[in-house]
């Protein structure tokens, strides 16, 4: 009889490296490790694949999903100007549904009836993975050894040392890091103390904002129907736009975020994020919407932007509400075409120019100089009618 196969989402890090070895010892099941290349950089994917085999996986598969991630997951984040709690551009959250998709495909291809992840019981990712599996493949069983067997980082490190698992994490450098082309997330260690400032070794995607203080970088991002299509006039793919802006904005220290966020499980958590390209693209897209969207549409979309970010953060990528919101957002992007110019400097993004053939900005109506076509004589009656409800309420309250 063939051994049962477990399909594991493998990152190459501590928890999933330990999980391969532990699953083999405790269950006698075979592990197929699935590595998803989301443009995380760092180690070569072949090195990560070989580590999975060295840890005991019977097979290790690398899926190049960089373009798919950029087009299908990062782009919607831009279209929705998605910042959870008005700050976090969903660096990790948007990657989980794509990983789920490829794990389900691997389970079907390799005859696995169990999928596994290395998430803890305190984080959001357990929800994102398992709700995703329930949405795409409710027949699959789920194994979560880190959560279900209460592994701590100390226990995982000890297990790795005892079993000669090839992973370089020690108690002296206990950061938990998740990264992809959209950004980088760092947590645990001394960062769990809210008063401790992050030190330079925490950062990787961004330089010290003071290094290039004398050489600010001006960049123009072009959009067609909300989609980034050019940088400084040169055509780019979505992946190319992210990568180019990661380099340029990262060199200016742009995209560093020190956030205390409300996790889905009910606790607050401190995270350090680096998302230079993401923050530039979201800033530019939102600015172009200010120019091209009618006032009421813009107001309402800002509400749906926030709700979309919350749904994705909370692991509801496949929810009917998110799908419906995206249909609405697609309709809003018809006129979001044009260019936004920004200066990247000292860790900040400063918009200093916008232009669009679809602009609702009318110079002749807006100017205070000669040539003003705004009929100011109409304002008196408008103000009277507009303020009438407040006037009536105030008169009543003074009785």
Swiss-Prot record:
The protein's gene is named argG
**Sites where the protein binds L-citrulline:** 88, 124, 128, 176, 261, 273
To which pathway does this protein belong?
A: Amino-acid biosynthesis; L-arginine biosynthesis; L-arginine from L-ornithine and carbamoyl phosphate: step 2/3
Q: Which HAMAP family match?
A: Arg_succ_synth_type1 (MF_00005)
Cytoplasm found in the keyword field:
yes
Q: Which Pfam families match?
A: Arginosuc_syn_C, Arginosuc_synth
The entry's localization annotation reads:
Cytoplasm
Q: Name one GO biological process term.
A: L-arginine biosynthetic process
Query: By what name is this protein known?
Result: Argininosuccinate synthase
Oligomer and partners: Homotetramer.
Q: Which residues of the sequence carry a binding annotation for L-aspartate? A: 120, 124-125
Family from the record: Belongs to the argininosuccinate synthase family. Type 1 subfamily.
Q: Note the PROSITE patterns from the entry.
A: ARGININOSUCCIN_SYN_1, ARGININOSUCCIN_SYN_2
Q: So what does this thing catalyse?
A: L-citrulline + L-aspartate + ATP = 2-(N(omega)-L-arginino)succinate + AMP + diphosphate + H(+)
Quote the NCBIfam families the UniProt record gives: argG (TIGR00032), PRK00509.1 (NF001770)
- Which parts of the sequence bind ATP? 9-17, 118
Which GO CC terms are listed, alphabetically? cytoplasm
Q: What is the lineage of its organism?
A: Bacteria, Bacillati, Actinomycetota, Actinomycetes, Mycobacteriales
Give the Enzyme Commission number. Answer: 6.3.4.5
**Organism of origin:** Mycobacterium leprae (strain TN)
**What keywords appear on the UniProt entry?**
Amino-acid biosynthesis, Arginine biosynthesis, ATP-binding, Cytoplasm, Ligase, Nucleotide-binding
Which GO MF terms does the UniProt record name?
argininosuccinate synthase activity; ATP binding
């Amino acid at each position: 009889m063939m051994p049962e196969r477990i399909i594991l989402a493998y990152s190459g890090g501590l928890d999933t490296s330990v999980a391969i070895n532990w699953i083999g010892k405790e269950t006698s099941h075979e592990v197929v490790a699935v590595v998803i290349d989301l443009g995380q950089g760092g180690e070569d994917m072949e090195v990560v694949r070989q580590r999975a085999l060295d840890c005991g996986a019977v097979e290790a598969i690398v899926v190049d999903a960089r373009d798919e991630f950029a087009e299908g997951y990062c782009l919607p984040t831009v279209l929705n100007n998605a910042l959870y709690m008005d700050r976090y551009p969903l660096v990790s959250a948007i990657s989980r549904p794509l990983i789920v998709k490829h794990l389900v495909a691997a389970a079907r291809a390799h005859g696995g009836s169990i999928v596994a992840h290395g998430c803890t019981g305190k984080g959001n990712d357990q929800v994102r993975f398992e709700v995703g599996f329930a949405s795409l493949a409710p027949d699959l069983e789920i194994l979560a050894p880190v959560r279900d067997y209460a592994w701590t980082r100390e226990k995982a490190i000890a297990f790795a040392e005892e079993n000669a698992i090839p992973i370089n994490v020690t108690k002296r450098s206990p950061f938990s890091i998740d990264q992809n082309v959209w950004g980088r997330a760092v947590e645990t260690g001394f960062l769990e103390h809210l008063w401790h400032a992050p030190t330079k070794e925490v950062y990787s995607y961004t330089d010290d904002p003071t290094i290039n203080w004398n050489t600010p970088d001006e960049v123009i991002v072009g959009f067609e129907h909300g989609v980034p299509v050019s940088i400084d006039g040169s055509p780019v793919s979505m992946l190319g736009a992210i990568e180019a802006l990661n380099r340029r904005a990262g060199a200016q220290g742009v995209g560093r975020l020190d956030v205390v966020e409300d996790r889905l499980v009910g606790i607050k958590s401190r995270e350090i994020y680096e998302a230079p390209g993401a923050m530039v693209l979201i800033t530019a897209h939102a600015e172009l919407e200010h120019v091209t969207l009618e006032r009421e549409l813009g107001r309402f979309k800002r509400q749906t932007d926030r709700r979309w970010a919350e749904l994705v953060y909370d692991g509801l990528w496949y929810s009917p509400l998110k799908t419906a919101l995206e249909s609405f957002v697609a309709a809003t992007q018809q006129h979001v075409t044009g260019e936004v110019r920004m200066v990247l400097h000292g860790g900040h993004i400063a918009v200093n120019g916008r232009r669009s053939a679809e602009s609702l900005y009318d110079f002749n109506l807006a100017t205070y100089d000669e040539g003003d076509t705004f009929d100011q004589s109409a304002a008196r009656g408008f103000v009277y009618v507009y303020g009438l409800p407040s006037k009536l309420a105030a008169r009543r309250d003074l009785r």
